[in-house]
Amino acid sequence: MMEPFRTHKGTVAVLMNDNIDTDQIIPKQYLKRIERTGFGKFLFDEWRYEEDRKENPHFPLNDPERKGASILITGENFGCGSSREHAPWALADYGFRVIIAGGFADIFYMNCMKNGMLPIVMDKETREKLAAIEARTIVEVDLENEVIMTTQHQFHFSIEKMWREKLLKGLDEIEITMQYEEYIQEYEEKVVH
C-alpha cells in the first residue's frame, strides 16, 4: 500500500525549462538498477554536476536556499521522451512529493501517480507566481480540497477523480482490483459453469 496523500507542506524548487525529458531527469547510464531507491543522487545529473562531480553552483536545485525542497515548479511538457519509471523514482527519492508543470507526458504523469507523487497541471501565470515566492516559504498542497496555499495566495487545481481517490487512499492497482474481488469471483463462476 502506498502512503495516502492528503496534504503536503514543503518548500519550492524552480526549474522552469520546457520539455524536460526523462533522460534529463535520470540519464540512461543509471537505469541498470531495479530498486526504487538510490536514484535521487542522479536526478538531473548532467545539469546538477560539473565534470569533476562537483555541484554546479548555477543549477537551481543546488541553491542552498532551495535544498530540501519537496515541491518542484517546472515548465511545459515535463517528463517527455522515453518511458522510464526511473524518472519518478529519482524525483521521489530526491524528496519531491509534488510536481507542478504546464503539462506532462501521459506515461510520466501516470507513473508519478503510481509512485505516490502528485503531478499538478497549472497555467504559466500561476506557476510564475508560485516560483516567485521567497525561498524557504512553506507551501501547502491540499489534495482533498484541490488547492495550493501560500501565506498570501490560494491557487485551485483539479485532478481526475480516479487519480485523486487513489492518492487520497494510498491505493495501488492491485489494491484497487481487490476492491472488486467478489465481482471477479462471481464472473469467474459464471464463465467456468
Swiss-Prot record:
The keyword Transport belongs to this UniProt entry's keyword annotation: no
GO CC, one annotated term: 3-isopropylmalate dehydratase complex
GO MF annotations, alphabetized: 3-isopropylmalate dehydratase activity
Pathway the protein acts in: Amino-acid biosynthesis; L-leucine biosynthesis; L-leucine from 3-methyl-2-oxobutanoate: step 2/4
UniProt keyword annotations, A-Z: Amino-acid biosynthesis, Branched-chain amino acid biosynthesis, Leucine biosynthesis, Lyase
Organism superkingdom: Bacteria
Enzyme class: lyase
Cross-referenced CDD domains: IPMI_Swivel
Catalytic activity: (2R,3S)-3-isopropylmalate = (2S)-2-isopropylmalate
A single GO BP: L-leucine biosynthetic process
Enzyme nomenclature, EC number: 4.2.1.33
Keyword Lyase among UniProt keywords: yes
Similarity remark: Belongs to the LeuD family. LeuD type 1 subfamily.
Its biological purpose: Catalyzes the isomerization between 2-isopropylmalate and 3-isopropylmalate, via the formation of 2-isopropylmaleate.
Subunit structure: Heterodimer of LeuC and LeuD.
NCBIfam families for the chain: leuD (TIGR00171), PRK01641.1 (NF002458)
PANTHER family noted in UniProt: 3-ISOPROPYLMALATE DEHYDRATASE SMALL SUBUNIT, 3-ISOPROPYLMALATE DEHYDRATASE SMALL SUBUNIT 2-RELATED-RELATED
Protein name according to UniProt: 3-isopropylmalate dehydratase small subunit
